[in-house]
């Protein structure tokens, strides 16, 4: 769910930027847990080569979800040595999700219904999240600045 324009939060030096289930505090840390539900990519030769490599990795890891394959190949030396791609992981403070919700509604740009099994569970918690956002947006500027606001989710998605 998009709450505000995320483009100001993208890294200008990165070719490929991806949201995280869990962010470790460093956007360069390859040990971050990527979530392929939200990706910002610059179209260039590096990213084209990277996507070809990622796509063919399905042959190396048959039956594996694309996100799980990415978790395997992100350590492959081919990516750094041959593509030259600059990969950055997006901070959950701005690009949160049910795994690690953004705690500051003054910062959050997007929230993802990740770490949640079942469509009904996702829809329920997304509705709650939207209601939380509406309550936050109804606050005055002073209330937003002085009163910490956070989500009441996840509830069904735990």
What feature does the model see in each segment?
Residues 1-33, 38-43:
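GT-A fold catalytic core of metal-dependent nucleotide-sugar glycosyltransferases
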Residues 41-158:
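Catalytic core and acceptor-binding pocket of nucleotide-sugar-dependent glycosyltransferases
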């Amino acid at each position: 769910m998009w709450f505000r324009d995320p483009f100001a939060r993208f890294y200008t030096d990165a070719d490929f930027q991806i949201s995280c289930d869990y962010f470790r505090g460093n956007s360069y840390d390859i040990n971050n847990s990527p979530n392929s539900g939200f990706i910002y990519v610059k179209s260039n030769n590096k990213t084209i080569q990277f996507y070809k490599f990622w796509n063919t990795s399905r042959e190396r890891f048959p039956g594996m979800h694309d996100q799980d394959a990415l978790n395997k190949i992100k350590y492959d030396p081919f990516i750094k040595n041959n593509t030259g791609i600059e990969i950055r992981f997006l901070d959950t403070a701005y690009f949160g999700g049910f795994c690690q919700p953004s705690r500051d509604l003054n910062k959050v740009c997007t929230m993802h219904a990740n770490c949640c099994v079942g469509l009904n569970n996702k829809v329920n918690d997304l509705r709650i999240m939207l209601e939380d956002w509406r309550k936050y947006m109804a606050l005055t500027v002073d209330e937003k600045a002085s009163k910490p606001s956070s989500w009441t989710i996840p509830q069904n998605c735990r």
